[in-house]
Amino acid sequence: MLILAIHQTPSLTQERYDEVVRRLTGKSRIESPSDLPFEGLLVHAAGQGPSGFCVFDVFELEEAVERFRNALGTIPEEVGIEEPPQFFPAHAAMSVPIERG
């Protein structure tokens, strides 16, 4: 079962997100599944919206969420992100090939 994660909270900023990515991957951006120290993340997107910075993830299974949480550890708290993301099972999902321009 696919698991969705949405993280859009007052303490999540682009700068804090970027620092989490640097600490988690050693890189400035996540561009490939091989950049991550865990398996099972199918979709990752992050960007600035009208209500603040937002991160959206789709995991293949609950076990992948646990691998994600274990890899993150306390990094979010260390950079000042106070609220956790929301996780819930997907009711419906579809995908199309993504072309990068």
What residue ranges belong to the model's regions?
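Short S/T/G/P-rich N-terminal loop/turn motif that feeds into the first structured element of a domain
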Residues: 1-56, 60-74, 81-101
